Amino acid sequence: MRGPGAVARWTHIPGTKIVALCDLLPERVEKSQEILKNAGLPAAASYSGEEDAWKKLCERDDIDLVYIATDWKHHAAMGVYAMEHGKHVAIEVPAAMTLDEIWQLINTSEKTRKHCMQLENCVYDFFELTSLNMAQQGVFGEVLHVEGSYIHNLEDFWPEYWNNWRMDYNHLHRGDVYATHGMGPACQVLNIHR
């Protein structure tokens, strides 16, 4: 799952201290604690079992960054709350579900002077960076039109998603739930917002 996988990645970043973990499901926090232990790192404070346990994590004084990898409908509210409590935030895609939520994140970031970053990994994968380099080197000539999409088949993971939230979005959008996965690399090739 996304959260414990992220914890494993963070253990490899020199100077990073993972001081608190939170998940609605206690067993996921325990899995992340095991990852810390196997990496030779100290246990982190644990928050779980309550819908609002994450707020207690955000209210701590010893946290600089809150990494948000929850169900999507909570991303924006969690990001806003964390920034309002003095934390920078890194939010898995999508960072928000509506334009109003996007503006809430932007306005809160500007008001609090805290960074808010949507974590869009697909613009940095091997294929995407190779294609971008080829476009920048002129291999394709002048690029005038680009299309992108991202279909994510999650059948093998259906039982792992709490309350089936992820599958509901996949069914509603036919699996193409990350516009940024397909369009982010396309925007890079076209030099949009660079």
PLM features: residue spans?
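Conserved beta-strand->loop/alpha-helix structural units within folded catalytic cores of enzymes
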Residues: I68-T70, E92, L119-N121
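FAD-dinucleotide binding site
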Residues: A20, D100, Q136
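ADP-ribose/adenylate-binding Rossmann-like module
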Residues: G86-T98
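Short, well-ordered alpha-helical microsegments
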Residues: V29, H75-A76, T98, F127-E128, ...
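Predominantly a Rossmann-like dinucleotide-binding segment in NAD(P)-dependent oxidoreductases
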Residues: R2-G3, T112-M117, C122-R194
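Short glycine-enriched loops at secondary-structure junctions
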Residues: W72, A95-A96, S149-L154
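N-terminal glycine-/serine-/threonine-rich beta1-alpha1-beta2 phosphate-ribose binding loop
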Residues: M1-H88, W103-H115
